[in-house]
């Protein structure tokens, strides 16, 4: 019974922290003079808290695993909602495809160049060998 309470507490804590980051992102988004979705800002808040180790990753892991496991199911309402705008999507299909292709190409270029830079720096760092002691 105690183990069940611990597991429930871990899930509750994980979802509460994720939701608090979402609320913080929505609050910041409302204060900004330009439009950035609150969910994006909330993810950046969560990332910052995790990267700076203010928030232990173990606290949000159970909730993240559960959300990732059921991610396909979570996209169904969005897909159904898009069908309400079928005529608009059909009219704008060309620009949508072109923007998807261009953004995919840009992401591939950025990732490729970033990988090359990181590999070059790793090779340079690997070349530096400590001097051997002559005994």
From Swiss-Prot:
Extract the Pfam families matched here: LrgA (PF03788)
User: Where is coiled-coil annotated?
Assistant: none
Its placement in the membrane is given as: Multi-pass membrane protein
Q: Which InterPro entries match?
A: LrgA/CidA, Uncharacterised_UPF0299
* One Gene Ontology term, aspect cellular component: plasma membrane
Q: What keywords sit in the KW lines? A: Cell inner membrane, Cell membrane, Membrane, Transmembrane, Transmembrane helix
Predominant cellular place of this UniProt entry's protein: membrane
The text of the family note is: Belongs to the UPF0299 family.
Name of the molecule in the record: UPF0299 membrane protein ECA2828
């Amino acid at each position: 019974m105690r183990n069940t309470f611990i597991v429930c507490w871990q899930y509750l804590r994980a979802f509460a922290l994720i939701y608090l980051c979402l609320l913080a992102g929505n609050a910041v988004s409302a204060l900004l003079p330009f439009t950035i979705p609150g969910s994006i800002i909330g993810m950046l808040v969560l990332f910052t808290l995790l990267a700076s180790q203010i928030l232990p990753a173990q606290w949000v892991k159970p909730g993240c695993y559960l959300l990732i496991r059921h991610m396909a199911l979570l996209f169904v309402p969005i897909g159904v909602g898009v069908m309400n705008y079928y005529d608009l999507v059909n009219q704008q299909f060309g620009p949508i495809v072109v923007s998807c292709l261009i953004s995919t190409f840009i992401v591939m270029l950025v990732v490729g160049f970033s990988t090359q830079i990181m590999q070059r720096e790793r090779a340079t760092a690997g070349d530096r060998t400590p001097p051997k002691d002559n005994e």
